[in-house]
Structure formats: structure tokens, C-alpha cells
A protein has these predicted regions:
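Extracellular/periplasmic metallocenter environments
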Residues: 2-11, 17-38, 63-66, 77-122
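A generic structural signal for short coil/turn motifs at secondary-structure boundaries
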Residues: 40-42
Length: 122
């Protein structure tokens, strides 16, 4: 194999690797609650959706009316935001890591009324 052909093959292989990495690592953005947004209509969301590590959940809501608190499983089950990571801008973006992440609203009885979601990223 001549030096020119080898260089061409190596360059093509490098380009293929770059293209594969780009398509594998591209993250998707999902609106929390779908078209309804983060609020009282969370029933069934995110059922049926597939999330990957690096995907982004976008929480849109009226600041002051809701918030988003990333909590443990125990906090999720008990609707207890103590020690959780609080987001309150009304346009919050959370990048998913491996495993299940739990989100609740700690305003009034919102969490116990269904303003909560568990999202699993693989």
C-alpha cells in the first residue's frame, strides 16, 4: 500500500469516528410535562419516552407559582424538598446523568397534587 493510500484510509477512518461520536453524543432537550409544561398535568409524563445521559429536561413554568427541586427517591416519595437542589427561574434546564432523577415542586401542596416527575437516563 502506498503512503498516499494509507493516509487517505487513515483520514477516512478518523472522519468516520468523528461522525459516529457526534451522532452518539448529541443530546436531546425534552420539555418537562410535554406540551402542558411543568404543572398539574404531569400525569403519565415521562412514560414512554427514552432519555439518555446528557439529555436536557427543560422546566417551564411561572416563577413564584411553581419551582423545581431535584431530590432523592425518599424526598420524591415523601414530597420533601429538604436538602434538594432548588431551581426557581421559570425556565430551568437540567442535564441528565446516569440513573433516575427525581423532581418535585415544593410550593404548597403541589407535589402531593402531582407536580412531580421521575426521569431515568441510560
Amino acid at each position: 500500500m502506498s503512503g498516499g493510500n494509507r493516509a487517505t484510509i487513515i483520514a477516512a477512518a478518523v472522519m468516520l469516528c468523528v461522525l459516529l461520536q457526534t451522532s452518539i453524543s448529541s443530546a436531546a432537550t425534552f420539555p418537562a410535562g410535554g406540551a402542558n409544561g411543568w404543572g398539574f398535568n404531569m400525569n403519565g409524563w415521562p412514560n414512554g419516552q427514552t432519555f439518555k445521559v446528557g439529555d436536557v429536561i427543560e422546566f417551564k413554568y411561572m416563577a413564584g407559582m411553581h419551582n423545581v427541586v431535584k431530590v432523592s427517591k425518599a424526598g420524591f416519595d415523601a414530597c420533601d424538598g429538604t436538602g434538594g437542589q432548588v431551581f426557581s427561574s421559570g425556565d430551568d434546564k437540567v442535564t441528565l446523568v446516569q440513573g433516575t432523577q427525581y423532581f418535585i415542586c415544593t410550593i404548597g401542596p403541589h407535589c402531593s397534587n402531582g407536580v412531580k416527575a421521575a426521569v431515568t437516563a441510560n
